[in-house]
Design a protein with these regions (language model features):
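Surface-exposed helix-capping loop/turn segments at secondary-structure junctions
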Residues: 49-56, 125-135, 173-178
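Bacterial N-terminal signal peptides
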Residues: 8-20
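Acidic/histidine-rich alpha-helical segments that form the ligand environment
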Residues: 100-140, 148-159
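Boundary at the C-terminal end of the N-terminal hydrophobic targeting segment
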Residues: 21-25
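Short, contiguous alpha-helical
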Residues: 33-37, 41-44, 54-97, 139-186
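Bacterial N-terminal signal peptides that target proteins for export
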Residues: 1-9
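Well-ordered alpha-helical scaffold segments within catalytic/enzyme domains
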Residues: 42, 46-48, 81, 121, ...
Length: 186
């Protein structure tokens, strides 16, 4: 192999190795915060996709309205993230009302504001913790028991995605394509 070819290979390995080192600097807290912020944008987009006049739509009498689905996420985010035992003051929610957590849908703007506030609270809480603190155990809700902070945060994210799936159906039943489907999905 010529000197030029060997030098070229060495340069390629150095570049690849440097990229790998950069990838190793990711942190649990950084990844979790990124996931939370990404989900905030995703949920605000799907919440905003429904026209305001259809915020009262529900597929059956037994289900929540579209606005109530959004408020459920907003309130659940606050309720669940309070279990991380952070020092940030939480927005007021009624923890005896697991449907909307006492939040009311007086307008689309109010609903979207509540959703953003719930996510902003989660962001503020997550910013308090280091990687080591995220793996510490806290008391979760009774149905989870003792959990790590990171599990509690990811449980909260997965709960919201469950509701996202329901909201996508609400949109399609009203002829609206969910935002993620407009851009080709995942």
């Amino acid at each position: 192999m010529s000197l030029v070819a060997r030098t070229g290979l060495i340069v390629v390995f150095i570049i690849l190795g440097t990229g790998h080192i950069g990838a190793q600097t990711a942190t649990l807290s950084g990844d979790l915060l990124t996931d939370w912020q990404t989900q905030k944008r995703t949920m605000l987009a799907i919440a905003d996709a429904m026209p305001e006049e259809l915020f009262g739509f529900k597929p059956t009498d037994a289900q929540r309205t579209y606005a109530e689905q959004v408020l459920h996420i907003a309130g659940a985010n606050v309720y669940l993230m309070q279990h991380l035992a952070g020092g940030v003051e939480a927005p007021a929610v009624d923890t005896t009302d697991f449907s909307t957590f006492g939040l009311e849908a007086t307008s689309k703007a109010v609903v979207l504001e509540a959703l953003a506030e719930g996510y902003d609270y989660g962001i503020a809480v997550l910013q308090e913790f280091s990687d080591e603190e995220l793996v510490a155990t806290v008391s979760g809700p009774r149905y989870l028991g003792e959990v790590t902070r990171v599990r509690m945060a990811y449980f909260t994210l997965s709960h919201a995605m469950d509701i996202y799936g329901q909201m996508a159906v609400y949109l399609r039943l009203n002829g609206v394509t969910p935002p993620a489907s407009r851009r080709g999905g995942v």
